[in-house]
A protein has these predicted regions:
Chain B
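Cytoplasmic/organellar membrane-interface segments at the starts of transmembrane helices
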Residues: 231, 343, 351-359, 413-491
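Short phosphate-coordinating micro-motif centered on Lys-Gly-acidic
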Residues: 132
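Alpha-helical transmembrane segments
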Residues: 34-41, 86, 109-111, 205-207, ...
Length: 625, 491
């Protein structure tokens, strides 16, 4: 038996897990695991033909249990997501090695468990991405859920509580998928993709609706789609730094992967489009699009309220997921490309942002946006990385986030969906405002006296951050590189493929060439620089000396406050923050609590014989009548 | 060799009556006699299982051919559960030596003999006798723990079980009055003409409620939380793990062979759904490990009843897989609960104190909520695919309830896991943290190892379960085995 490339990849990943498990307590274990991730990435790159539309690579691993065939294989879709997974795993793990690891262990963290959880997450994600039928998809799905639980819970305390909330949501989602699986099986008699594809054609509308709700809801839980989003931000934010970079980059995209595979590829956007909601003008597809849009808006504005940098970023992670789904649901060449490209772009800048914030925590010990400020001179490289990251997150040129968002907007306009477009723009507005809060409160404004001696983050942390920053810029300049992979993914899932060039897209309804855009932008910067430097000498003063503008104030006087940022805006939109989703969640829990009390009362009653006899009488009466 | 089957019941029975006397003569000899008998029983059954041709066979006791004489019926299903009874009897053997040990060991032998009899009996009256014997042995064993709570729980159980027995007897009387026979194979022949009427239904329902007391059927299961919380963990494990399944097996046999009314299945389905809802929800607020496990056991048995209600024995495979899975998991969990009694909040920090036990708890919980690729997932998968294939809306409701209950189950099980893995509170001395250890941990480890082995060997295990289920589903095979076409050829 010869090993296929996919076998090699999975074995490699399994070996990484074993290394983390058995020698993960030793010296330099982190570096060893990181190198192994690099090896996995190389194996994946050997399969690069997949990313350019090169067929399927199957795994030799397949077996039959209770009449069900289980198989695993990689295609362009899996390859694209696996690339992001392994890339973010490699860089997050690299980031964790060395300085961060030592300080984490010093604070009482279990670094062995951390590396183990990371390796487990990567392996389970690869298994999920390789799934060749719906049953292996479900197996992979559950593995990813529980592996994620381990990574989220390992910090203990608040993190464990957040992880508990996550796993309850994830179980609910998982069971919805499980139910959907059973329904699919009952009509197709098999869970193989081709059999399901045929069965979908003859399915009744009711059943299709039910399946769209079950699968959409189930997969949506992991994506953090409204109204199942409450778990995500605390769970990701409280994970130890590099872990949240990894989770924020890729974890919830597994939901999008599954949606692409099941709802888009198997059920088909056309079929979903034909599901009308009675007595209204909208259909299931519009419903998904509007859910996506609300997922953009609400979490983004919630992010603006956060005072913890990690929570702020995690809330954005939910909102950005909305853009991806929106693009995919619009489903024309540009929209699909935008949604899929955003998966890649989001992973790059989200990981960079989480890392930058973790670097700040590493040096200052806090992520509280009200207790930081002025670090730009102390940590200039981290500032640069964060700046590049937030430009990407806000979707502004010249970074990669602009390209994907532009594609999504363009497709909304092309397809005549102005309301959705407007809503998406409102979301972007919120993003820009809140990322400004992020960079301002950490790096700009007044430096705190206690941070005067803060140094730049160590190189073990800086290197992966700089690599990510470079990727963000380069894929912003040449979006054609990832767009090539995206186009093959579109073909695989049955969406129209986009017509891409190195600098962007070619289309009759509007082209984009980032090389030109960035060229013009940098020409502008150049002119600005010429004016700045020709204006004469500037005088350098100590940072703590330059706030007072001539007044005699010592540095320990706070005269620039970052507290209660956007007070005016919050006053304006405050009425919308009623916490209705929290209320919904609480009422479900109270309901279960109440029912549980009733049931316990039922079992606590002493007159058990009465139950027995009355049941007997009741059934007898039922028989006689 | 087939004749030796009767020994698996007779020897433990004999042992049970002789043990108190033998213990007086020689303690050293008396201590080993019980395990020796059970080990021999395991060997007989294991031998039958391995060397037999996998064809069912019937053993007529006392030389009278059925339906006049009584017979033991051994297909792979019955053998499997008989083997489980002997093996679990051995595993949960009350090794502790004190002045009560003779009585406790004798009762345990009695319980195993009765359980084996329940698995193997081929006629209704013997089933009833063994059923009563199980009840008597259980009362004795629960009360043996000696606390006043245990006595109170036993009394409640005794009364409930007594009324249940009367109902069972009433059902049997109805059947006998109608058909004049109690042999299951004979009944299977006569049933389509004589029992597919209201009388038959009434008989079945009184049997269902009567036997349901032991099978933790809602709403006659109110004894469960008290008894499991007060009896010794080993006994709770045996009761929740095995005895409830055997009671279930009787109902399943009756349903398959004798009562084909759709109403019968419907009642089981409704009661099963109510069992799942009540059990899992009650477990959500349970403040103590064993009580939580007891409620969860009620819920799991409810799931089994839902599976059993599938028409024409379609749920056979699901029932079998779920029952065996629950047997392993609950036994293991009760063993862990042995060292982890008391309020759940007390368990903070016990993962650091006993990491293996905590790991096993997580493993069992994961399998119980059905995480693939653990066996629990496959058991649940067989159930939901069958349920989703039904057109009757009540089955789909069963499916929905089952899935929702799993979410609740995961929430409360992992809440406990989170407590276990929390760091211990500062003010507590290390010796105050409950530790799971010794024999119970070893036993739980055994079940854990079995679970992992099954995970790895899931494909062959699945195939074997499918053949067992197919054989048990075959009504004609049952009749032909007990009444061979050419008389006298069976022995």
């Amino acid at each position: 038996m010869t090993l296929t490339l996919l076998d090699e990849l999975l074995l490699f990943s399994g070996a990484t897990l074993l290394v983390a498990l058995f020698i993960g307590r030793g010296l330099a274990a982190g570096w060893m695991v990181t190198i192994l991730y690099g090896g996995q990435l190389l194996t994946l790159l050997k399969m690069a033909a997949l990313g350019y539309g090169g067929g399927i690579i199957a795994s030799s691993l397949s077996f039959t249990v209770m009449g069900q065939n289980l198989s695993w294989r990689f295609d362009a879709l899996s390859w694209f997501f696996a690339l992001i997974t392994l890339g973010s795993a490699l860089l997050s793990s690299w980031f964790a090695c060395g300085a961060w690891e030592r300080s984490y262990a010093k604070q009482g963290g279990n670094i062995w468990l951390f590396h183990l959880a990371m390796a487990l997450n990567v392996l389970s994600m690869l298994i999920l991405l390789a799934s060749g039928d719906l049953l292996s998809l479900f197996i992979g799905w559950e593995l990813v859920s529980w592996a994620g639980f381990l990574l989220m819970a390992l910090a203990g305390g608040v993190a464990t509580q957040a992880a508990m909330r996550y796993i309850t949501y994830a179980m609910a989602g998982g069971m919805a998928i499980f139910g959907g699986l059973a329904l699919v099986y009952s009509s197709s008699g098999s869970l193989q993709l081709d059999a399901v594809l045929i069965a979908v054609e003859s399915m009744s509308t009711t059943k299709l609706w039910l399946l769209v709700i079950l699968f959409g809801g189930g997969f949506g839980v992991k994506m953090g789609l409204l109204p199942f989003h409450l778990w995500q931000a605390p769970a990701y934010a409280e994970t130890p730094g590099p872990g949240s970079a990894f989770l924020g980059a890729i974890s919830s995209r597994m939901g999008l992967f599954a949606i692409l595979l099941v709802l888009v590829k198997l059920f088909g956007i056309v079929n979903i489009d034909s599901l009308k909601i009675p007595f209204t003008l909208i259909d299931a597809r519009d419903l998904l699009a509007w859910i996506a849009v609300f997922t953009i808006i609400f979490p983004t504005f919630t992010a603006m309220k956060q005072n913890d940098a990690r929570h702020l970023l995690a809330w954005h992670g939910i909102g950005q997921g909305g853009y991806m789904l929106l693009g995919v649901v619009v489903a024309d060449a540009m929209g699909g490309a935008g949604g899929l490209l955003h998966v890649f772009n989001h992973a790059t800048y989200q990981a960079a942002l989480f890392m930058a914030v973790t670097a700040v925590i590493h040096r200052t010990g806090t992520a509280d946006l009200n207790k930081l400020g002025g670090l730009v001179v102390r940590m200039p490289l981290s500032f640069m990385v964060l700046l590049i990251g937030i430009i990407g997150l806000a979707g502004l040129p010249p970074m990669n986030g602009f390209v994907s968002k532009w594609l999504v907007y363009r497709s909304l306009l092309n397809e005549g969906m102005p309301l959705l477009f407007l809503a998406a723009v409102i979301g972007t507005l919120g993003t820009i405002l809140s990322v400004y809060k992020l960079i301002h409160n950490i790096f700009l404004g007044q430096l705190r006296v206690e941070h005067e001696q803060v140094k730049e983050a160590p190189w073990s942390m800086m290197a992966p951050m700089l690599i990510l920053a470079a990727i963000i810029f380069i894929t912003g300049l040449f979006p054609g590189i990832p767009l090539a992979w995206v186009a093959s993914v579109q073909e695989v899932v049955g969406l129209p493929a986009t017509d891409y060039t190195l600098g962007g897209v070619e289309s009759v309804s509007g082209s984009l060439d980032m090389i030109w855009v960035i060229g013009v932008l940098f020409a502008g910067f150049g002119i600005g620089a010429v004016i700045f430097y020709s204006a004469g000498r500037s005088k350098r003063v100590h940072q703590l000396d330059n706030y007072a503008g001539g007044h005699f104030l010592s540095a320990d006087v706070r005269y620039q406050y970052s507290d209660n940022f956007y007070a005016g805006l919050m006053h304006l939109v405050g009425g919308w923050y009623r916490g209705s989703f929290l209320w919904l969640e609480k009422s479900v829990i109270s309901l279960i609590d109440f029912l549980s009390l009733v049931m316990q009362g039922l079992y606590r009653r002493a007159n058990a014989e009465f139950y027995l006899l009355s049941t007997a009488l009741f059934v007898m009466a039922w028989v006689v009548i | 060799m087939n004749g030796a089957l009767a020994l698996t019941i007779a020897l433990p029975l004999l042992g049970a009556f002789l043990l108190p006397v033998l213990m007086r003569v020689s303690v050293a000899f008396g201590v080993w006699i019980g395990p020796a008998i059970l080990a021999y029983g395991c060997w007989i059954l294991g031998d039958l299982w391995l060397t037999g041709s996998m064809q069912p066979f019937s053993v007529a006791l006392g030389g009278f051919a059925p339906p006049l004489g009584i017979n033991l019926y051994a297909d792979t299903l019955a053998l499997l559960f008989a083997l489980a009874a002997q093996l679990l009897g051995l595993i949960f053997w009350p090794f502790k030596l004190d002045q009560d040990s003779a009585r406790r060991q004798a009762l345990m032998l009695l319980l195993v003999a009765a359980s084996t009899g329940l698995a193997l009996s081929g006629d209704l009256f013997n089933l009833y006798v063994f059923y009563e014997l199980t009840a008597v042995a259980t009362f004795g064993l629960v009360a043996a723990s000696g606390t006043s709570a245990a006595y109170a729980a036993t009394i409640r159980y005794l009364i409930l079980s007594g009324i249940g027995s009367v109902l069972t007897l009433f059902g049997i009387a109805l059947i006998y009055g109608q058909t004049g026979t109690l042999n299951l194979a004979h009944l299977a022949q006569l049933a389509p003409e004589q029992l597919s009427n209201e009388l038959g239904l009434a008989a079945f329902l009184s049997l269902l409620i009567g036997i349901g007391v032991k099978a933790e059927l809602f709403p006659v299961n109110t004894w469960v939380p008290e008894v499991y919380a007060t009896a010794s963990s080993r006994l709770s494990a045996f009761l929740a793990g095995l005895v409830s399944k055997l009671a279930l097996l009787i109902i399943l046999r009756l349903l398959l062979l004798v009562f084909h009314q759709p109403e019968a299945a419907q009642v089981i389905l409704i009661l099963g759904i109510l069992g799942v809802v009540s059990g899992e929800l009650a477990a959500w607020r349970a403040k103590e490990m064993r009580r939580m496990l007891a409620f969860s056991s009620i819920g799991q048995l409810g799931v089994l009843f839902i599976a059993m209600a599938l028409p024409d024995g379609q749920g056979m495979l699901a029932v079998l897989a779920l029952a065996l899975h629950h047997l392993v998991i609950k036994s293991g969990l009760f063993m862990l609960a042995d060292g982890w009694g008391g309020a759940l909040q007390r368990l903070r920090g016990s993962a650091a104190a006993s990491p293996l036990a905590a790991g096993l708890f997580v493993l069992f919980s994961l399998s119980l909520v059905g995480m693939p690729p653990l066996p629990g997932f496959w058991a649940k998968f067989t159930l939901i695919t069958e349920l989703a294939g039904q057109t009757e809306p009540l089955y789909l409701m069963g499916l929905t309830v089952f899935l929702l209950a799993t979410v609740v189950e995961a929430a409360y099980l992992f809440r406990v896991a989170a407590i276990i893995y929390q760091s211990a509170p500062q003010e507590r001395r290390p010796d105050e943290i409950p530790k799971a250890g010794g024999l119970s941990l070893a036993t739980a480890g055994l079940f854990g190892a079995g679970l992992i082995a099954t995970t790895l060997l899931i494909a062959p295990v699945g195939d074997r379960l499918q053949t067992i289920a197919a054989q048990a589903q075959d009504v004609d095979l049952y009749i032909n085995t007990v009444f061979p076409a050419t008389p006298g050829a069976s022995q």
